[in-house]
């Protein structure tokens, strides 16, 4: 059974593409028809592609991998943040800083600065520093949290990227491709699907559509995590059973 229904997709307006004059011919195979100068996306293909993306992210999560959610356009910012947090993943929803993946060593120094400023406040340094300096530190902290707060706990490269609108996030995609990080993306009729490993043909401009699909990808990750925890429990139970059997064998021998 598909993880998403045609009814859900229709209600969220996932089928509305861009105007026919603003399209990428490579998206032709995902287009059902044209209506009033707007392309209509083939939702049967979207259902299938959502399944593929879901299963991929579920497997990444089962294997203990982390996913970076990227969506800096207004329609995606809230969904990307809330769904990444719900699944315990990382996100960028303001601006992609150049080198975020390819020059992570430098970016990680800026992330470290967040903790440094927090420690200064905890240690009471804000009480003794000049007021002007404290104001500047708070401004710096707010700026760092705004742009890097979503990846402050990211200690290594993500195993996958989930992107809303590849045209908008071309820098993120270029860096991920350079590092061979697989990309799942919500791809509208004006985008190049060749840049994306797991294409989800869909409206990337409607908040409801973006929310629905982003939530499904978060669900996939959560389901994968459930698989990991179930395996861990099963492994622990097997260890306990082995130890119990050994204990019973020892007692029988002693008797």
From Swiss-Prot:
PANTHER family xref list: 30S RIBOSOMAL PROTEIN S2 PROKARYOTIC AND ORGANELLAR, SMALL RIBOSOMAL SUBUNIT PROTEIN US2M
One Gene Ontology term, aspect cellular component: cytosolic small ribosomal subunit
Lineage: Bacteria, Bacillati, Bacillota, Bacilli, Bacillales
Residue ranges that the Swiss-Prot or TrEMBL entry lists as coiled coil: none
Family membership: Belongs to the universal ribosomal protein uS2 family.
Transmembrane stretches, start-end: none
GO biological process annotation, one example: translation
Example of a GO MF term: structural constituent of ribosome
Location of region: Disordered: 226-255
Organism of origin: Staphylococcus aureus (strain NCTC 8325 / PS 47)
UniProt xrefs under Gene3D superfamilies: Glucose-6-phosphate isomerase like protein, domain 1, Helix hairpin bin
Entry-linked NCBIfam families: rpsB_bact
Designated name of the protein: Small ribosomal subunit protein uS2
Organism domain of life: Bacteria
Keyword terms, alphabetized: Ribonucleoprotein, Ribosomal protein
